[in-house]
Structures are given as C-alpha cells and as structure tokens.
Amino acid sequence: MKPLGDVPWPPDPIVTDRLILRETRTEDRKGLAELLSDETVQAYLGGPQHTREELEELIPQDPNTRPGIFAVEHAGEFVGRITIQRRDRAWAHHVREEGDEVEIGYEFLPITWGRGIATEATRAALGWIERTLPGEPVVLTTQVANEPSLRLARKLGFVEVERFMGFGAEQWFGHLRDE
C-alpha cells in the first residue's frame, strides 16, 4: 500500500452531524494505542502487534505520519480512524488493469459499535474521495469472517469483485459500485 501522493494533505476537517474527520494529532496517541492494542478491533487484522503500553511509547509525538489517515472524533474524543491509500500495483487483486485504485479501510473502538458511527464516518470519507479524486474507483478488502465489516461495506454500496486467500484467511475484495 502507498499513501495518496497526488492529494494535498491534510485536508480541511470534515464535519458531519456527530463527527469530525481530521488529521491525527498528538492528543490522539492514547486513543490510537487503545485502537491498535484492542484484541477485538484487531481480531481480523492479524491481532495486536504490541501492548497498549508499548504503543504509547512507539507512536510518535506527532502521529500524523502520512497522508490519508483521518482521525475520527466523536464528542471531543478519538474513536477510530479511516485510512485512504493507493492500492499498490503489486497486489494481484484490482478492478482496473493498471491497479493503483483508491482503497479505504476503517477501524473503530468498540464503544462506537452499533451506533452508526462507522457508517457516518466512512460515508463522509467516501464523499471526500469523490470530491477530491472524482471518478476514481474505490476498493475495500476485509476478511469474510469479519461479518460487521462486510455488512458495513455492503451498506456503503461496495459490491464483491472476488474472494481470495490472504493473511491466512479468506478475504473479500469489493469496489464501490457506480451510482
């Protein structure tokens, strides 16, 4: 995967009814450490690679390390992140021959689950993609076993392109259907 080198970053914050999507900040470090060390959140992403304490040491003071990562804020607190990046051409799974599609991903703290926050945030990010990179195909990959992620992808309008084995599990690869 590679960052969005063709997009000015950071963008202006995106404000929805309940959320703010913005660049990550120093005050997000604690929430990022919680997100990246939570076994439930990371269950379909290979599991936590570090403890929360280790991550609090490893995450840079300025966690805004690359373009394409939106921190999601709800009621003044970091609750998750959305990543937007170019899908590297080396991957075997693409929707266009030359690859390099825009790929979106999302991770949210369990306190947000079932409240529509992931849907609201991801819709806002998809709107930003459409305004910033009009006409670009948008793709998403999630484990087939990650039923909540798969439901969200379908709810957002992603349709299955194919399934494949990767990272020791069956993966679902989809693209955002044209309206």
PLM regions and their residue ranges:
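Active-site rim helix/loop that mediates acceptor-substrate recognition in acyltransferases
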Residues: 48-71
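Acyl-donor (CoA/ACP) binding surface of acyl/acetyltransferases
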Residues: 1-44, 69-179
